[in-house]
């Protein structure tokens, strides 16, 4: 990274970031019936912000770097958004610092990100530069591990495709009557036009051996549970989103994991309110389908878990051959640079 400052920080931050009021947790990409769905372009919504794109192999410290930078600013009371890896919730794919208009993202597969305007909108940081070339003696082993990892992801996507088909079937079985729910909600919420309108599309849930939700990690002023049918909930969310967009009300759409064209929840950012889908049904066929969906997502999650374990093995190989002293220096330099950057 060019023009690195000489000033250093001693990073002794303990990385515990759950349930802090100034931190929000999301997924920017998820494993779905359509493969990996990538909404990383929704991380940094600042007009003149900058995004640092991390490159480098597994085990080179990308997630740890982001955790340390994020916690440095979070422990100073600043708002920080953490974007978790949908295949390993304990790992990060990105962070966003709205006060500074800065994002740091993992730009490696499956969410490959390249600079569109280098040194203007994005800066590339290649942590792969600090991998010792002795790692090459493990080339065949790494290649075989990556092949097996890919097979498990392909299996996971097959199960998710089946689960998504049944999810869509339940959409057709649901009652579409919203009974003026949207109008009543809008009257009770009294939403105001935002001074700086922003819209994002992200995810709050992902598939593992069970459906993982980040809902409990976030602190909201209020959470409303929408308990109409699956179909009716989606209609209400679409109407709320349309109203928010037309009236320049900042909001975050949190999409469904089994069909990302539908909305699972909507967050109204200015008042820190979340409206979340808790669908109910008495339809016997829909209930039966849901049981099958649960089995299919479990099967998908079991393959994602196997892929994650393989990924950990690959990480261990690279960890042995990575110079983390250099990466610590980069982390400290980034903090120094970000402190001077203010969102415009």
Please give the residue ranges for each predicted region.
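Phosphate-binding P-loop
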Residues: 42-48, 214-221
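Short, Lys/Arg-enriched N-terminal segments with co-localized hydrophobic residues
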Residues: 6-19
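Glycine-rich phosphate-binding P-loop
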Residues: 52-69, 221-244
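Conserved nucleotide-sensing/catalytic segment adjacent to the nucleotide-binding pocket
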Residues: 25-28, 74-132, 245-302
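Hydrophobic, helix-prone linear segments
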Residues: 18-71, 75-90
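An accessory alpha-helical subdomain
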Residues: 141-192, 300-341
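N-terminal pre-Walker A segment at the start of P-loop NTPase domains
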Residues: 20-40, 188-213
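A cross-family "folded-core" feature that marks the main globular domain of proteins
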Residues: 54-55, 65-66, 73, 81-86, ...
